[in-house]
Amino acid sequence: MIQVLLVTICLAAFPYQGSSIILESGDVNDYEVVYPRKVTALPKGAVQQKYEDAMQYEFKVNGEPVVLHLEKNKHLFSKDYSETHYSPDGREITINPPVEDHCYYHGRIENDGDSTASISACNGLKGNFKLQGETYLIEPMKLSDSEAHAVFKYENVEKEDEAPKMCGVTQKWKSYEPIKKISQLNLIPEQQIYDPFKYVETVVVVDKAMVTKYNGDLDKIKTKMYEAANNMNEMYRYMFFRVVMVGLIIWTEEDKITVKPDVDYTLNAFAEWRKTYLLAEKKHDNAQLITGIDFRGSIIGYAYIGSMCHPKRSVGIIQDYSPINLVLAVIMAHEMGHNLGIHHDDGYCYCGGYPCIMGPSISPEPSKFFSNCSYIQCWDFIMNHNPECIDNEPLGTDIISPPLCGNELLEVGEECDCGTPENCQNECCDAATCKLKSGSQCGHGDCCEQCKFRTSGTECRASMSECDPAEHCTGQSSECPADVFHKNGEPCLDNYGYCYNGNCPIMYHQCYALFGADIYEAEDSCFESNKKGNYYGYCRKENGKKIPCASEDVKCGRLYCKDDSPGQNNPCKMFYSNDDEHKGMVLPGTKCADGKVCSNGHCVDVTTAY
């Protein structure tokens, strides 16, 4: 039996109420002082990392005990992550900082199923968490010889400017030209198996105005970007995306473009710079410019719609207008959402009763959730435009430079690379040779634990749906096996549907996503409207013309739902928008009859559909 050593730090956990204080997040007029207690279970004899993969903290909020569970965000940085700034004489300085043992976490509150957390544990706890439906911020109070932290609500941070802040996107621009993969990287065979997650390899660019705003403190700027990216990563996790930082560029001496308050000018200039310079220097899928200037009017962000993977337009520009990093993350997530084909939410969209990320303006309490509309629009864009650059998970093999032992990048010929002998914190790896130490089977990976392969059968990737079984360690490798799905067309949900790319699409779920609770699939007679071939009732478009459904295909056109919600009696409810004609259509792979599924507007035999 494995003995467990319980490590307890700072036993004090009593709260204290304060009326006003100045913190990094701004002037806070109501806060609570807490003393988080860290409790971590370590196997006896285990070597503790500087920042553990999993941690647990206990403290009190409003007098009630809270247990915060944290897990390191292992998808925050790519293995070839780089940072670039410039010397006073204009020389470019690029480094590959150690990122494996970073201090950024996602988490949850014990016994609160709707809770979330995005926390930096670099110097105390700093970040945000959702508890009982409310968003709280936490950060150290920077008192000498004290573990005191302040916990407060976003609404209690004084705002310098109460005017509503808006996204500048008003036009429904879409790129209908074929979007080709920018990178020449070929997927390894294991990656050709369908992966439920998409990976957006992102470069963040910080302009000279930001450097001036933060008095040239590059560490403060970097920390702000890390925390914002960690928040953003959590937001996209529920969309089945991983937003991975592959690079941070800080224009320390001068801007590489002219950054103006005119968002149209600045967005186009940044897009041109990205296309002509950045793509040649750094493999990536998307770039975001963070600026310290004030955009014209109330605009704080701007981006192209439906442009992910486009060599020029896969960009967004964001104004850093709030000291709260969660706010910056929301704007970054919002603008990237436009790149992924997502429009602004309207009155029909919802996200569990909370404000939604894709609202046209920043809500009084920044949201961490995408709406049902956003989910449908995003995946509709992916299915219809196939932006291939987001299909590959960032790997060490993406690196083009010659292998170099000690750079913390796992390259050809190396079994491990933990940095220089002075900085190496991996007990499994010989830093001088980049080979595993004697007796070690592995040095990293989801199936590696204390330098040994994890036991065969240990779960390493959870099931995401009935059509997506969990993966388990083999006992022979440090890596989790490739993610595999049940075969397309296999029955699921008690034969109500058929598996399709790891999901089980059925009309009831699609109705719920569009309209909310008390919504069901409509009677068959409602779908007869799809025979009309008019502006809303059709099966598919060919050369811009809407093709009416044949009798056997009517359940593969517009989706019809029965609304039994209070005060409603609509047996044939449907959704149509001129701005997004695809929204409200039955999704591919949906069951349309016994033994049949929708494919390109036809109801076809499931045995031949795939």
Swiss-Prot record:
Record Pfam families: ADAM_CR (PF08516), Disintegrin (PF00200), Pep_M12B_propep (PF01562), Reprolysin (PF01421)
Disulfide linkage: 309-389, 349-373, 351-356, 405-434, 416-429, 418-424, 428-451, 442-448, 447-473, 460-480, 467-499, 492-504, 511-561, 526-572, 539-549, 556-598, 592-603
Cofactor note: Binds 1 zinc ion per subunit.
Key words of the record: Calcium, Disulfide bond, Glycoprotein, Hemorrhagic toxin, Hemostasis impairing toxin, Hydrolase, Metal-binding, Metalloprotease, Platelet aggregation inhibiting toxin, Protease, Pyrrolidone carboxylic acid, Secreted, Signal, Toxin, Zinc, Zymogen
Root EC class: hydrolase
Boundaries of every Disintegrin domain copy: 402-488
Binding-site residues, Ca(2+) 1: 201, 285, 389, 392
Active site (record annotation): 335
InterPro entries recorded: ADAM_Cys-rich (IPR006586), Disintegrin_CS (IPR018358), Disintegrin_dom (IPR001762), Disintegrin_dom_sf (IPR036436), MetalloPept_cat_dom_sf (IPR024079), Peptidase_M12B (IPR001590), Peptidase_M12B_N (IPR002870), Reprolysin_adamalysin (IPR034027)
Peptidase M12B domain ranges (all copies): 198-394
Cited SMART domains: ACR (SM00608), DISIN (SM00050)
Localization: Secreted
One biological process term in Gene Ontology: proteolysis
GO molecular function list: calcium ion binding; metalloendopeptidase activity; toxin activity; zinc ion binding
A GO term from the CC aspect: plasma membrane
Keyword Endoplasmic reticulum: no
Catalytic activity, EC: 3.4.24.-
Lineage: superkingdom: Eukaryota
Residue numbers bearing the Pyrrolidone carboxylic acid modification: 192
Task of the protein: Snake venom zinc metalloprotease that causes hemorrhage and dose-dependently inhibits platelet aggregation triggered by collagen. This inhibition is due to its binding to glycoprotein VI (GP6) and collagen. The binding to GP6 results in inhibition of the signaling pathway (decrease of tyrosine phosphorylation of signaling proteins such as Syk, LAT, PI3-K and PLCgamma2). Preferentially cleaves alpha chain (FGA) of fibrinogen, followed by beta chain (FGB). Also degrades the extracellular matrix protein fibronectin (FN1), and cleaves collagen and von Willebrand factor (VWF).
Note: Negative results: does not degrade gamma chain of fibrinogen. Does not inhibit collagen-induced platelet aggregation by activating alpha-2/beta-1 integrin (ITGA2/ITGB1), or by inhibiting alpha-IIb/beta-3 (ITGA2B/ITGB3) interaction with fibrinogen. Does not cleave platelet membrane glycoproteins, including glycoprotein VI (GP6), GPIbalpha (GP1BA) and beta-3 integrin (ITGB3).
Family stated for the protein in its record: Belongs to the venom metalloproteinase (M12B) family. P-III subfamily. P-IIIa sub-subfamily.
The protein's name: Zinc metalloproteinase-disintegrin-like acurhagin
Organism expressing this protein natively: Deinagkistrodon acutus
